[in-house]
Swiss-Prot record:
This is Large ribosomal subunit protein uL15. InterPro entries: Ribosomal_uL15, Ribosomal_uL15/eL18, Ribosomal_uL15/eL18_sf, Ribosomal_uL15_CS. One of its GO terms (cellular component) is cytosolic ribosome. PANTHER family: 60S RIBOSOMAL PROTEIN L27A, LARGE RIBOSOMAL SUBUNIT PROTEIN UL15. The keyword DNA damage does not apply. It comes from Drosophila melanogaster. GO terms for molecular function: structural constituent of ribosome. Keywords: Ribonucleoprotein, Ribosomal protein. Residues 1-31 have a biased composition (Basic residues).
């Protein structure tokens, strides 16, 4: 062999332990697999680099009703925009006594609020909730408020 410095691995070929001691040394998973020992022999590492990894916080609420106040709202001034301009013009042209039915729940709204003004035209509005103002304005225009479940 040339006088290039030998690497350690080449030197250790042919020796059983290859520089790792006697029986059972340098084998398999001496510290356990994965996150094993986080509460025990790897405690220092977990406390230093992953604080709060173990344990519970706070209390659970078994009967929590997350969406019980979910109530998408729309104002009166936007009410006819749900029907559409062409439908509104068609109703104006006919001058019929038929009142269109607007079901707010189908459009994804639950509550009707009273901001804005309504055209002096009867309309039947179905919703889960009405504000007092909205109800008064609809009745003033000759319409009806229907509560839907």
């Amino acid at each position: 062999m040339s006088n290039i410095k030998r690497k350690k691995t080449r030197k250790l070929r042919g020796h059983v332990s290859h520089g790792h001691g006697r029986i059972g040394k340098h084998r398999k998973h001496p510290g356990g697999r994965g996150n094993a020992g986080g509460m025990h022999h790897h405690r220092i590492n977990f406390d230093k680099y992953h604080p709060g990894y173990f344990g519970k916080v706070g209390m659970r609420n078994f009967h929590l009703r997350r969406q019980h106040k979910f109530r998408p709202e729309i104002n009166l001034d936007k009410l006819w925009s749900l029907v559409g301009a062409e439908k509104f013009a068609e109703l104006e042209k006919e001058k019929s006594t038929k009142a269109p039915v607007i079901d707010l729940v189908k459009f994804g709204y639950y509550k009707l609020l009273g901001r804005g003004h309504l055209p002096a035209r009867p309309v039947i509005v179905k919703a889960k909730y009405f504000s007092k103002k909205a109800e008064d304005k609809i009745k003033k225009a000759g319409g009806v408020c229907l509560l839907s479940a």
